[in-house]
UniProtKB/Swiss-Prot annotation:
Entry protein name: Bifunctional protein FolD
Any one Gene Ontology BP term: tetrahydrofolate interconversion
Upper lineage: Bacteria, Pseudomonadati, Chlorobiota, Chlorobiia, Chlorobiales
Pfam families: THF_DHG_CYH, THF_DHG_CYH_C
EC number: 1.5.1.5, 3.5.4.9
Gene: folD
Disulfide bonds: none
Length: 298
């Protein structure tokens, strides 16, 4: 059984990106810039933003964090995004979720220039992805990171049956579409399961690859997996644990302790998919910079 180590793959990728950023600096006397906007004081969001900023600095990218109070109006936020759209030193714009209830998520997504939408959420980027024009878009970071793990671990995917559990716009839908694409990391027969699927264990037991992104702690159990399946756990859930100083522990959407006895390869939580999400955000930001400066990928 192979443990797919996203933490190590992410570290390796960051080193490669650091080299690429330095090569860009030597060619253009400039480096990629990522700006993250956070509205309000959600503690988890602040941790995520700090991690993104730290990762940027580690590879030599410029990182700017704009902190706005929770009472910021939608119009004020959209005006700030427009200013960043027009700033040539900004190559990636990310608005940290969740936003306060009075701000429309869709309006914010639409306001970001598709060429700077390094989260890959703008309909133009989603549409290009669905059409298979992956060189003309940004791919949503978590699904992109999973493809990278398949590539780095030489997971055989062509013609395999892949079951994606979850249909969110951030992971489930783009992941299912990417697994359909004619890529060396995908090219699968794809089934999507979700909260209204009545016979889910029957379906998942047929899968060569299971990607769990349903947001339920340890939902995927050993009896739902066939022997030798590859299991990718996207979930990050807090469960109470009085034995821990924090009072909780992190678990995924998969019952790791039991499923790993049956799987041929599996991602742990933490340390599996999570670290890849930020790494692919950096990769998308670098790609944005390279498109602006007409630099071809190595």
């Amino acid at each position: 059984m192979t443990i797919i180590d996203g933490k190590q793959v992410s570290a390796n990728l960051k080193q490669e990106l650091k080299t690429a950023v330095e090569a860009c600096r030597q060619k253009t006397d400039a480096v990629p810039g990522l700006t993250v906007i956070i509205v309000g004081e959600d503690p988890a969001s602040q941790v995520y933003v700090r991690n993104k900023s730290k990762s940027c600095k580690e590879i030599g990218m410029n990182s700017t964090v704009i902190e706005l109070p929770a009472e910021t109006t939608e119009a004020e936020l959209l005006a700030g995004i427009e200013a960043l759209n027009n700033d040539n030193d900004v190559h990636g714009i990310l608005v940290q979720q969740p936003l306060p209830a009075h701000i429309d998520d869709y309006a914010v997504t639409m306001a970001i220039l598709p060429s700077k939408d390094v989260d890959g959420f703008h309909p133009e980027n989603v549409g290009q992805m669905v059409l298979g024009n992956l060189d003309k878009c940004f791919i949503s970071c978590t699904p992109y990171g999973i493809l990278e793990l398949f590539s780095r671990y030489s997971i055989e995917t062509k013609g395999k049956h892949c079951v994606v559990i979850g249909r969110s716009n951030i992971v489930g839908k783009p992941m299912a579409n990417l697994m359909l694409q004619k890529l060396k990391e995908s090219n699968c027969t794809v089934t999507i399961c979700h909260s209204a699927t009545s016979n889910m264990p029957e379906i998942t037991r047929q899968a060569d690859i299971v990607i769990a992104a349903i947001g339920r702690p340890e939902y995927v159990t050993e009896d739902m997996i066939k022997p030798g399946a590859v299991v990718i756990d996207v979930g990050i859930n807090r469960v109470e644990d009085p034995s821990r100083k924090s009072g909780y522990r992190l678990v995924g959407d998969v019952d790791y302790e039991n499923v790993n006895k049956k799987a041929s390869a599996i991602t742990p939580v933490p340390g599996g998919v999570g670290p890849m999400t930020i790494a692919m955000l950096l990769k998308n930001t670098l790609q944005s910079f390279m498109r602006v400066h007409n630099i071809e990928s190595a």
